[in-house]
From Swiss-Prot:
SMART domains on file: LeuA_dimer
Gene this chain is encoded by: leuA
Family: Belongs to the alpha-IPM synthase/homocitrate synthase family. LeuA type 1 subfamily.
Residue intervals of the Pyruvate carboxyltransferase domain: 5-267
Native source organism of the sequence: Shigella flexneri
EC code: 2.3.3.13
Cofactors, names only: Mn(2+)
Name this protein carries in UniProt: 2-isopropylmalate synthase
Pfam family, any one: HCS_D2
GO biological-process terms attached to the record: L-leucine biosynthetic process
Region (Regulatory domain): 392-523
GO CC annotations on file: cytosol
Cell compartment(s), UniProt: Cytoplasm
């Protein structure tokens, strides 16, 4: 009988560590709701003790996610576990995930401790976590380089202390698949109480073996796989969840396991994570790359036309990729736009129809036909920028040529006031940015600039993603338009609004702190 493999997503915790700019609470919630819709069993959404922002993110997601178990990370430290529990207590169901290093190298050089002390600490902290929840996961950091006898001792002790899931990470992506399978098999042979916990694996891709190691572990008896959408994560990344999920589905004949994932949501979730995290998906990426279902060889094309199974082991439709793209025009009404969004699987709560339709009409007037990928791009950008704006791009004009210095004139609405400036720059985009900086007097440093075509051909939309540095903090902005300079300007305005909102939040926190201090003095 087929057994279920629990899918544990860590996109918002381990995955986010790879990003150049931290995600906002709103962006994290968007991803969390998409993961819930996809059907992940557990989502690890942050490290609450690390910052007030992470605490708020975990708490917000814990409050809103209902159908997936929400998890937070904690070191084997009392405060970590207490803060994690505090952030999670609003959840329908939650898990505390605590960890400590177990390899001789980590114990000696990082912890400056002994294996016996590590075991004692693990027991104490697992018991502390069990005071808050019956669902406690314990991880043996660097398990891949831990002698099996030592690892078995730690695992047995953690289970006796109350851990319900034991995670075996290949923290540095060092282990070969046959070795990793041997570790899992070895634990089943050596740990007498192993039947009282789920064995989980968490692999990294430093040698390109994360997915292979996870599948080898599943074949050896692991029943939870941890990973991130699109494989994002530190260094070379985490195990790509979409790859493991589809491998389990396609090769159920030899693995004899299944997941509870809604496979039709894989494509959408992957695209959303890519866009929000500003991490483009390589064309040759398995499962979700733009070339994953493309056939250029004449022999292959002929074979696919005769029978898709000749060269396709899965279909685009099996991951929710609809290859039939319909187009709308400026004559299409609101009902037609809503109907198409419904057909693509979007709920009304995921976008603002009024804003989407306004943006759709402007785009349709410019390019004539609007395709599915255009609508999705407009909906995504609208969601990112739907919060109140202090800055708004009112007008811009650029002049440049092969022998001319680029000049830009920009008019920007700043609250109730409209300001205008002109500036020169190293190209039209830089000129626009210089003019915007003059208007706002923000000393914004551009760290990263990327341009992605959304759609096909000469009428494709250009999405600009930028990462900026302002007062020691990283801010991400995104802009979308048929004109690249306009996209770039909108991305910078998005950054400015994010900076302004962050400053307003800081002012409010200071006001509350001062209010509390005044109350103490009164008492």
């Amino acid at each position: 009988m087929s057994q279920q493999v629990i899918i544990f997503d860590t996109t918002l915790r381990d995955g986010e560590q790879a990003l150049q700019a931290s995600l906002s609470v709103k962006e994290k919630l968007q991803i969390a709701l998409a993961l819930e819709r996809m059907g992940v069993d557990v989502m690890e959404v942050g490290f609450p003790v690390s910052s007030p922002g992470d605490f708020e993110s975990v708490q917000t997601i814990a409050r809103q996610v209902k159908n997936s178990r929400v998890c937070a990370l904690a070191r084997c430290v009392e405060k970590d576990i207490d803060v994690a529990a505090e952030s999670l207590k609003v959840a329908e169901a939650f898990r505390i995930h605590t960890f400590i290093a177990t390899s001789p190298m980590h114990i000696a050089t990082k912890l400056r401790s002994t294996l016996d002390e590590v075991i004692e600490r693990a027991i104490y902290m697992v018991k502390r976590a069990r005071n808050y929840t019956d669902d406690v996961e314990f991880s043996c950091e660097d398990a891949g380089r831990t002698p099996i006898a030592d690892l078995a001792r730690v695992v047995e002790a953690a289970i006796n202390a109350g851990a319900t899931t034991i995670n075996i990470p290949d923290t540095v992506g060092y282990t070969m698949p046959f070795e990793f399978a041997g570790i899992i098999s070895g634990l089943y042979e050596r740990v007498p109480n192993i039947d009282k916990a789920i064995i989980s694996v968490h692999t990294h891709d430093d040698l390109g073996l994360a997915v292979g190691n996870s599948l080898a572990a599943v074949h050896a008896g692991a029943r939870q796989v941890e990973g991130a959408m699109n494989g994002i994560g530190e260094r070379a990344g985490n195990c790509s969840l979409e790859e493991v999920i589809m491998a389990i589905k396609v090769r159920k004949d030899i693995l004899n396991v299944h997941t509870a994932i809604n496979h039709q949501e894989i494509w959408r979730t992957s695209q959303l994570v890519s866009q929000i995290c500003n991490m483009p998906i390589p064309a040759n990426k398995a499962i979700v790359g733009s070339g994953a279902f493309a056939h250029s060889s004449g022999i292959h094309q002929d074979g696919v036309l005769k029978n898709r199974e000749n060269y396709e082991i899965m279909t685009p439709e099996s991951i929710g990729l609809n290859q039939i793209q319909l187009n709308l025009t400026s004559r299409s009404g609101r009902a037609a736009v809503k109907h198409r969004m419904d057909e693509m699987g979007y709920k009304e709560s995921e976008y603002n129809l009024d804003n989407l339709y306004d943006a759709f009409l402007k785009l349709a007037d410019k390019k004539g036909q609007v395709f599915d990928y255009d609508l999705e791009a407009l909906a995504f950008i609208g969601k990112q920028q739907e919060e109140p704006e202090h800055f708004r791009l009112d007008y811009f004009s650029v002049q440049s040529g092969s022998n001319d210095i680029a000049t830009a004139a920009v008019k920007l609405a700043c609250g109730e006031e409209v300001k205008a400036e002109a500036a020169n720059g190293n190209g039209p985009v830089d000129a626009v940015y210089q003019a915007i900086n003059r208007i706002t007097d923000y000393n914004v440093e551009l760290v990263k600039y990327s341009l992605t075509a959304k759609g096909h051909g000469k009428d494709a939309l250009g999405q600009v993603d930028i990462v900026t540095n302002y007062n020691g903090r990283r801010f991400h902005g995104v802009g979308l338009a048929t004109d690249i300079v306009e996209s770039s300007a909108k991305a910078m305005v998005h950054v400015l609004n994010n900076i302004w909102r962050a400053a307003e939040v800081e002012k409010e926190l200071q006001r509350k702190t001062q209010h509390n201090e005044n109350n103490k003095e009164t008492v």
